[in-house]
Amino acid sequence: MKHISVLLNESIEGLNIKPNGIYVDATLGGGGHSLEILKKLDKGHLYAFDQDAYAIGRATERLKDFSNKTFIQSNFSFIKEKLNELGIYQVDGIIFDLGLSSFQIDDETRGFSYLKDYDLDMRMNKDATLTAKEIVNTYERQKLADIFRAYGDEENAWKIAGMIVDRRPLNTTLELVEITDIANKGMKGHSAKRVFQALRIEVNKELEVLERALNSALELLNIGGRLSIITFQSLEDKMVKSFYKTHSQMDYPKNIDIRTFPKPPLKIITRKPVLPSEIELEHNSRSRSAKLRIAEKQS
């Protein structure tokens, strides 16, 4: 399936790109956002991150006509360190698209999809060691239930965890789906959606990685530089929203002229998240849960 970048125009416009600026695509994926950034650059430069060597290989071909780019195979939690190694200490904009690419979802070796029978893997970085198979076959029932509840908001977390322990070993996605079908019979939506989300987050440590990346991104931004972040699930969106809020407020002493105090680090550009249009939803059903939040560095 061809990968379609979600909220493409809105997220790129939100960066307020300067032709000679330095920009970062923290989630290269299919290269759609990188392509649009490069189209707007003159003497500027793009640094694009992805921990997936396959994604970088595809993007290398797609973006071969542009010389002002650098690909970095790394988890975006190391965005600051990797850029510093290249002598880059400040940038003018950073975009994060936190969704899986269609290539990853449809890649049978990844095991992200609960619609076909794949190996239980779920690693975004194939060089990483922890897999979903290891989790479901080695974690204790309580730990499994905690993960399903915290990362998937799964109502039947304890029941599903117990069934997994009793059914071990599990090797494929549909073996896990058989369990969720029984545990979540009659519930709205696909029975395995929340469990698969929780396992993917645990395998890739997605929330820890995002927290570290957000703090690094704020340090990297020039004054006037922007963060453009697309999320696809509530935990990530809450984290981004909270980060923006925390860094756009300051506790001023009472009865003091706040004009004499420095501004908070961030100014929120999108008071409410930008959502996909009806037209985009018609053309790309995977965009349905997407939310875009934009903020600008001001101090």
Curated annotation (Swiss-Prot):
One of its GO terms (biological process) is rRNA base methylation. The keyword Zinc does not apply. Keywords: Cytoplasm, Methyltransferase, rRNA processing, S-adenosyl-L-methionine, Transferase. One of its GO terms (cellular component) is cytoplasm. InterPro entries: RsmH, SAM-dep_MeTrfase_MraW_recog, SAM-dependent_MTases_sf. It is an enzyme of class 2 (transferase). Its EC number is 2.1.1.199. It catalyses: cytidine(1402) in 16S rRNA + S-adenosyl-L-methionine = N(4)-methylcytidine(1402) in 16S rRNA + S-adenosyl-L-homocysteine + H(+). It is found in: Cytoplasm. It comes from the Bacteria. GO terms for molecular function: rRNA (cytosine-N4-)-methyltransferase activity. SUPFAM superfamilies: Putative methyltransferase TM0872, insert domain, S-adenosyl-L-methionine-dependent methyltransferases. The keyword Membrane does not apply. S-adenosyl-L-methionine binds at G31, G32, H33, D50, F76, D97, Q104. Belongs to the methyltransferase superfamily. RsmH family. Specifically methylates the N4 position of cytidine in position 1402 (C1402) of 16S rRNA. NCBIfam families: 16S rRNA (cytosine(1402)-N(4))-methyltransferase RsmH. This is Ribosomal RNA small subunit methyltransferase H 1. It comes from Acholeplasma laidlawii (strain PG-8A).
